[in-house]
């Protein structure tokens, strides 16, 4: 009889062995840090193609985006609760943006957001 080879079935999981380093210890898998860095960079290149950004400035911009995101998410969540709704829609987000951002900045943000939602729905 021919020896049978073990074939991994679909959905089965294998134990992954850690790779060893030169010193003989096990290599640790580094946890990935999520960031808006690539998107900030893409927007920068659209606005100012010949301008760069330092890593420290990128950290500050990433922190800024996270802060604004949390403020908008929190405010839109509150608005949904006030209106006894369990889902945050684009309407709650738009109202939250109007409440959080001042004057002209809110108008521009709302128009850009509306444009992005329209582009997304037409592409489907």
Swiss-Prot record:
GO terms for molecular function: DNA binding; protein heterodimerization activity; structural constituent of chromatin. Pfam families: Histone. Its main location: nucleus. The keyword Metal-binding does not apply. It is found in: Nucleus; Chromosome. The keyword Ubl conjugation applies. Monoubiquitination of Lys-119 gives a specific tag for epigenetic transcriptional activation and is also prerequisite for histone H3 'Lys-4' and 'Lys-79' methylation. Core component of nucleosome. Nucleosomes wrap and compact DNA into chromatin, limiting DNA accessibility to the cellular machineries which require DNA as a template. Histones thereby play a central role in transcription regulation, DNA repair, DNA replication and chromosomal stability. DNA accessibility is regulated via a complex set of post-translational modifications of histones, also called histone code, and nucleosome remodeling. Belongs to the histone H2B family. The nucleosome is a histone octamer containing two molecules each of H2A, H2B, H3 and H4 assembled in one H3-H4 heterotetramer and two H2A-H2B heterodimers. The octamer wraps approximately 147 bp of DNA. This is Histone H2B, embryonic.
